[in-house]
Amino acid sequence: MEFLIFSDSHGSASNMSLALDRQIKTPDAILFLGDGARDIDNLFVVDTPIWAVRGNCDWASSDYADKTERLLYFEGHTILLCHGHEWGVKGGLGALIAHAAEVGADIVLFGHTHVPTLTTIAAGETVGKTVLSRPMYLFNPGSIGYEGSFGVLTFKGENVLLSHGKL
């Protein structure tokens, strides 16, 4: 299963379309992490589910981005989608990590900073009152609108693969 991840398009639906066109195969789903949610309405994909959240610049939400946070469940993993502004990610990831542990997420996808990021917290580490039973992955695809960066999440058996791409 493979997901194409976008954040922070800020009016550049064309960059999302270009990234989608450059994929070897059509992703199983598209995940959008806020700031440009209305751009999703201009993204033409057939039979590809889209899950999205609103960011701090999404005053009028798209039909897809009616919430600021979503939990998805795939391949035995709990995926937290959020923009990150509500957790102060520009100042650090501590609050977001604590929240992810509280809701049981082991894959955390966020935007807001426009900086591609991948951080892993090892299984067995303590986060707040929670001892992680599996690794926690924190991933920011960067800004598809400004820097042309995006992400890909792939599940292969027990493995979680997260990678960054650039136009």
Where are the regions that the model predicts?
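Active-site environment of divalent metal-dependent phosphoester hydrolases
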Residues: 10-15, 37-41, 57-62, 87-91, ...
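N-terminal active-site segment of His-dependent metallophosphoesterases
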Residues: 1-50, 62-67, 148-149, 157-158, ...
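Conserved beta-strand segments of alpha/beta enzyme cores
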Residues: 2, 49-51, 78, 137, ...
